[in-house]
Structure formats: structure tokens, C-alpha cells
From Swiss-Prot:
Required for nuclear import of FGF1, but not that of FGF2. Might regulate nuclear import of exogenous FGF1 by facilitating interaction with the nuclear import machinery and by transporting cytosolic FGF1 to, and possibly through, the nuclear pores. This is Leucine-rich repeat-containing protein 59. InterPro entries: Leu-rich_rpt (IPR001611), Leu-rich_rpt_typical-subtyp (IPR003591), LRR_dom_sf (IPR032675), LRR_domain-containing (IPR050216). The modification N-acetylthreonine is found at T2. Residues 148-216 form a coiled coil. Residues 266-307 are lumenal. It holds the Pfam family LRR_8. SUPFAM superfamilies: L domain-like. Residues 154-221 have a biased composition (Basic and acidic residues). Residues 150-241 are annotated as: Disordered. LRR repeats lie at residues 10-31, 40-62, 63-84, 86-107, 109-128.
Length: 307
């Protein structure tokens, strides 16, 4: 790359008063460091070179009052171009500019501007006008500054709107996060209360079980003497042998019937002379005589009469 220092010698040699002419120097880049060392050079001519860009530190040359960048290949100006607040005269004729940086609105001292022969944005081209003479170039400077201030204001409003949207979104996120945290705190609080209630119930149940176990031996101890000192259960009175007596009576009745039948046969019929009947009659007479004095028979007869 060709620099002014190497092609044109020392810059101080080219300084004429406050004017520094570096035009037609076949420059591909601006010697910013060397220019910064010459604050006296308030008028700088860089026209008719091969500059396609300006470095960002070029905007630090705030001592510049008049700047000629015409007939180069500039496609854009640095974003901080507005730092050149002392600039009054700016020639950008015949470059490749489409737009200007928003900071251009900060060039409050700009009185003269030429933007002819640039592929400007249609809106900016209409604002800049033709700039065919001194008057039109002054009007161009004023109108372009007003336009860039409006663009800057629009961008600032848009920036503020985006910031507001971001703030609202942040507030919503914070509110959502706070609601989530509050919900989590409430959930933890409820779980803690439920756990405490569960433990309390377990504690009460353990105490109740312990009291019940302590009461049990006392109850058994109180019931033990009662079982010893209490009267024995009374045995049910012996049941009367009604059925046995009935069977006995039936047997006796059958026996009596048999005996009576035999007696009748032996006493009434003509068989009483038979040896068997004689024996039967004798036994009968003896039995009747003995039974009349027998205590068992008397007891049976008495029992029967009582029933």
C-alpha cells in the first residue's frame, strides 16, 4: 500500500500554512498517525486517490475544518464520523456512497456538502439535491443534517421502543420467575406442614399406644384378685332323672303285666293245679306279703304320688 509519507516525503514539507494537500498521491490508505501529529493542518485534501475505506481512528482528527475526499472509491464512512465536530466543509463528490452514518447528524458546524455522483439511497439523494453551485451545496449540508437528525431520532425511538419491549419482557420474566418461586415456596411450606402433621400424628399414636400398654398390666392386676376372691360359679342343680324313672316305670309295668297275666292264668284258669302254677302262686303270695313291708316299694309309691 502507498502512504503519503513514503511517496510524497515528509508531510510537514507539504504543509502550507494550515493546508495539507495529499491529492493525487496514489494513496490506498490514510496516514492517520502522521496527520494526528499535525493538528495545525485544519484543511486536508485527499482527493483523487484510491481510498476505499477510512480507518476508525480517522475520526480522531477533530481539528479538521475542511476535508476533501472527492474522486476516491469510498463505499462508506466510519460509524463515528460525527466526532469530526469542527468540520464545516466536506466534499464527497464522485465516490461509491449509498448511505451516511447516523452520527453524521452530530456535524453541527457543517455548512457545505457535496454528494454528487454517488449511488445514494433514493430518499437521501432527494434530500441532498443536485448541489450544482455554492448555494445548493450549502442547502445540501443543511437539509442532509436535518434528515440525518430525523433518522437519528427515529433510530433512537426505535431503540427506546426495543429497550421498552425488552424491559417489559424482562419484567414478565421476573414476574413469572417470582410467581414460580412463590409457588415453590408455598409448595415447600405445605409439604413441610404436612410432614409436621404426619409426625405429630405418629407421635400421638405412639403416646396413645404407650399409655394403652401401661394400662393393660394394671387392668390385669386389678382383675386377678377379683377372680380369686369372687364366688365360684354355682353348679346347676342336678336334673331330675325323669326319663330314667319313666323307663323304670315302663319296665315295672311290663313286668307287672307279665306277672299279672301269669297270675291270672294260674289263679283263674284250671291250670292252677299244675306244678308250675303252684310254684307261681306260692311265689306270688310270698312276694305280696314281703312287699307290703319293703321300704323301696313304699318310697317308689310315694314318689309317684308326689309327681
Amino acid at each position: 500500500m502507498t502512504k503519503a509519507g513514503s511517496k510524497g516525503g515528509n508531510l510537514r514539507d507539504k504543509l502550507d500554512g494550515n493546508e495539507l494537500d495529499l491529492s493525487l498521491s496514489d494513496l490506498n490508505e490514510v496516514p492517520v498517525k502522521e496527520l494526528a501529529a499535525l493538528p495545525k493542518a485544519t484543511v486536508l485534501d485527499l482527493s483523487c486517490n484510491k481510498l476505499s475505506t477510512l480507518p476508525s481512528d480517522f475520526c480522531g482528527l477533530t481539528h479538521l475544518v475542511k476535508l476533501d475526499l472527492s474522486k476516491n472509491k469510498l463505499q462508506q464512512l466510519p460509524a463515528d464520523f460525527g466526532r469530526l465536530v469542527n468540520l464545516q466543509h466536506l466534499d464527497l463528490l464522485n465516490n461509491r456512497l449509498v448511505t451516511l452514518p447516523v452520527s453524521f447528524a452530530q456535524l453541527k458546524n457543517l455548512k457545505w456538502l457535496d454528494l454528487k455522483d454517488n449511488p445514494l439511497d433514493p430518499v437521501l439523494a432527494k434530500v441532498a439535491g443536485d448541489c450544482l453551485d455554492e448555494k445548493q451545496c450549502k442547502q445540501c449540508a443543511n437539509k442532509v443534517l436535518q434528515h440525518m437528525k430525523a433518522v437519528q431520532a427515529d433510530q433512537e425511538r426505535e431503540r427506546q421502543r426495543r429497550l421498552e419491549v425488552e424491559r417489559e419482557a424482562e419484567k414478565k420474566r421476573e414476574a413469572k420467575q417470582q410467581a414460580k418461586e412463590a409457588k415453590e415456596r408455598e409448595l415447600r411450606k405445605r409439604e413441610k406442614a404436612e410432614e409436621k402433621e404426619r409426625r405429630r400424628k405418629e407421635y400421638d399414636a405412639q403416646k396413645a399406644s404407650k399409655r394403652e400398654q401401661e394400662k393393660k398390666p394394671k387392668k390385669e392386676a386389678n382383675q386377678a384378685p377379683k377372680s380369686k376372691s369372687g364366688s365360684r360359679p354355682r353348679k346347676p342343680p342336678p336334673r331330675k332323672h325323669t326319663r330314667s324313672w319313666a323307663v323304670l316305670k315302663v319296665l315295672l309295668l311290663l313286668l307287672l303285666l307279665c306277672v299279672a297275666g301269669g297270675l291270672v292264668v294260674c289263679r283263674v284258669t284250671g291250670l292252677h293245679q299244675q306244678p308250675l302254677c303252684t310254684s307261681v302262686n306260692t311265689i306270688y303270695d310270698n312276694a305280696v306279703q314281703g312287699l307290703r313291708h319293703h321300704e323301696i316299694l313304699q318310697w317308689v309309691l310315694q314318689t309317684d304320688s308326689q309327681q
